[in-house]
Amino acid sequence: MASRVQKKDDDESDFLFENLDKGQVIQEKRAFNESPIHPRKCSLVISQFLYLLSRGDSFTKTEATDIFFAATKLFQSKDIPLRRLMYLLLKELSTISQDAIIVISSLTKDMSHKIELYRANAIRILCKITDSSILPQIERYFKQSIVEKDPHVSSAALVSSIHLLKVCPEIVKRWANEVQEAISNKSNMVQYHALALLHRIKQHDRLAVSKLVSNLIKNSLRSPYAQSYLIRCCVEVIEETNTEDRIFREYIESCLRSKNEMVAYEAARSICTFKNVSNKEINSAVGVLQNFLNSTKPTLRFAAVRTLNKLAQTNPTAVIPCNLDMENLITDTNRSIATLAITTLLKVGNESNVERLIKQIANFLGDINDEFKIVVVDAITSLSQKFPKKYKHLIIFLNKILRDEGTLQLKQATLDAILTVVNNIPESKEIALTELCDYIEDCDFPDLSVQILHLIGQEGPLTSSPAQYMRYIYNRVLLDGGIIRAAAVTSIAKFGLLYEPMKEKVVILLQRCLLDEDDEVRDRATLYLKLFKENDVRYLNKVLMDDVPVPLNNLQKSLELYLHQGDFSEPFDIASVSTVVETYQSPLLGDGKSPFSTGASKKGDSVTGTPKSNNASNNNNNNEESSGPESFATKLSQIPQFSTFGKLLKSSEYIELTETETEYVVNCVKHIYREHIVFQFNCTNTLNEQQLSNVSVKMVPSDPKLLKYECSIPIDVLPYGEPQQCYVAIRYIPANGYPLCSFSNALKFKVKEVDPSTGELDEPGYDDQYSLERLEIVPKDFLNRAFVGNFSEEWKKMSEDTQLVQTFSLVGVKSIDEAVKQIIKTLGMAPAEKSEVVTPKSAKHILYLTGKSLNNQLIYVRARMKLDQSQTNTDVELTIKSDDESLNDFVISAFIEK
């Protein structure tokens, strides 16, 4: 009788390692010690270890060391597949185990082996375990491997060198000749890796990078990977040096005609990111992307439509020729491509097809992930500004996204979009509030409920039928948690303030809240009831309607620090709170910038995919910024020389005085007191062969009459890689005016050579100095931010008799948004009435700023600006009001040289 075939359960897994136990596998390592070696058995055990590591299982140092040294016994095996697995295991464990350095002799022996596989893998492991003391001993092996004819060995050496460049930059830089030779290798991958390494070696020398790129353009690389990288290098040179040399642009344009799709796409993408681009250049790039839209390859279609989506934000006219092709992509089976196609069409489309596009998006909204939904929401937001009459369709669509399942990030982006529509289109207010009232009945995110209640309280009383919203608000008091109940109480009180007919009902509802179990709810209700009974409309307006001028998280940290310090002789000053907030950038669209620059990269290594370690300067900054600017006051007050200076009034941002990858990295922070300025120099020694002692900064002022040298605090010893601070204090007389001047600076120190292998110092050393960038004292060093509830009212109150009006031009500032940022940065004052927000492509704008001097005199600034006829400069009319004419002159001196 025929045997019965059993059907395997679909849920049954036949994966061998699924239920693997770490302890059991560790016991299996004894197979490595067997003699003779059984390749098949050892290969299985190594595969199990590699699976555990990839799964995220952690090994202690002892466990990792035992496994590592057991695996080294496999160097005796001649089985190539087993050796390959052994190299992989050693590479993974090398960063965990102790004394991995012992295998260097075996690895260097393999680097001379006739089998290329051994040589390449040995190099990869050496890269992991080598430090600055070992690399000089095996340097020759790396140099030989870089110029090796076998592409596997050469590529392994080049990529390993990219990693070693972070550990021992001075040694790797000596290999530039070998790397230059490797660029001529016939292998596509070797050319690519050689160019990547050579660029990193030279990246802090702009002239050297420019020469490198120029030479490679003439020699025409064969590798498409290297050509793509070279295009990015060209973009870097163009952006960093602002060069007008056509050779770089012409090379990128020539790559548009490349037969290789990757090279052609990279060229088109780069042209789309240029700040100054001609119609001919952009049309050629868009033409290439248009061809890719019709490609059979999903990756090409996705890359092209994503680039066009980004371009549509800055140059929608250039994208219009692709509309028909993108409409064909709306039905693409890849939902990511379809979403980007529709959002791009929304940015460049016309009013007649908006409804159709929105309906098409709604049909497959559930099939795309939240990241792409955020892209859709952003497109809808920009669409509301372009076609305000379509607000009903936009609000309904956004509300659908809000109600569907999704992350808080998506919900927040959607709510922000609805708020933008309400702010820009007053007619949309009632339909938006109605939809949001329904949403908070079943909202899973307290943060969103609080924001919506705030909006209803602000806008609900001003609608045609305010009473309809009260039921939704009071339901939150009855049904939700303490945070939401407190927000609901405030929202109810706003109705009583802004809509007089409901005042009595509001008082009744607030009285019911007096028995709430939550302190915050009871306290708010008590305060509002007291103000209503006293009919204190002015204070009610201030409490209920004025926005907090700083981010609440920053305010909380500053208040906690104020309480912790325990010095209550002076009241808390809200102007000391930082206004910096984090913003979200969708990773789908990217930033359109080159992935590398002459400074330290923030996004990591573009070739190897590993994160870059922060440079010494950045580490130095982060150590102090982690606790906020207020930490400076605590630290400086503990230094005896500065303890008599009084209260710290202001600290500047970090000012770089050297390049980030030089021998000595120095930046400065200016600390302003009532009669003193303390310069804090953060110094880092990046040379492991040197130890510095008696480190100080010599400052020579451009106008010595304005100030007097007070004291200097040097660094006793500055070893390799340990950031430390030295200080210089000067004194000035406020009655004589603030000391606006510049300083030439030099870092002075004694150098003692260090043997990196033993740590021994070469006494007695020698004196040396290192030139630093000039440092300036500018007006914003003596100006603090100030916040007012209503700028317009305060502006009117100030007399025009003492106002100062000055016109000037910001040369080379080609956009209003850039001009606004430059003025705010130059004065260091606080924007008022959200005037820092600029409408896209606006040709004129008015910016309002408020600040105060160090003696607490208020300053109000109004900056009217517009682009000139050439569209290359911005004309500014600056009006300054304060009670002191000399203060007005002082503020304007930030822009006008007297």
Curated annotation (Swiss-Prot):
Name under which the protein is recorded: Coatomer subunit gamma
The family this protein is said to belong to: Belongs to the COPG family.
Write out the ranges of the repeats annotated as HEAT: 62-99, 170-207, 280-317, 319-352, 353-389, 392-427
Entry's localization field:
Cytoplasm; Golgi apparatus membrane; Cytoplasmic vesicle, COPI-coated vesicle membrane
Q: Which organism is it from?
A: Dictyostelium discoideum
What is the documented function of this protein? The coatomer is a cytosolic protein complex that binds to dilysine motifs and reversibly associates with Golgi non-clathrin-coated vesicles, which further mediate biosynthetic protein transport from the ER, via the Golgi up to the trans Golgi network. Coatomer complex is required for budding from Golgi membranes, and is essential for the retrograde Golgi-to-ER transport of dilysine-tagged proteins.
| Any one biological process term the GO annotation gives | intra-Golgi vesicle-mediated transport
Residue ranges for the region (Disordered) are 592-631
What membrane topology term does the record carry?
Answer: Peripheral membrane protein
Predominantly, its location class is cytoplasm
Q: Where is the composition biased (Low complexity)?
A: 613-626
What InterPro entries does this protein map onto?
Answer: ARM-like, ARM-type_fold, Clathrin/coatomer_adapt-like_N, Clathrin_app_Ig-like_sf, Coatomer/calthrin_app_sub_C, Coatomer_g_Cpla, Coatomer_gsu, Coatomer_gsu_app_Ig-like_dom
Ordered alphabetically, the record's keywords are: Cytoplasm, Cytoplasmic vesicle, ER-Golgi transport, Golgi apparatus, Membrane, Protein transport, Repeat, Transport
- Output the Gene Ontology terms for molecular function: structural molecule activity
Q: How does it assemble?
A: Oligomeric complex that consists of at least the alpha, beta, beta', gamma, delta, epsilon and zeta subunits.
Q: Is Hydrolase tagged as a keyword?
A: no
An annotated GO cellular component of this protein is: endoplasmic reticulum-Golgi intermediate compartment
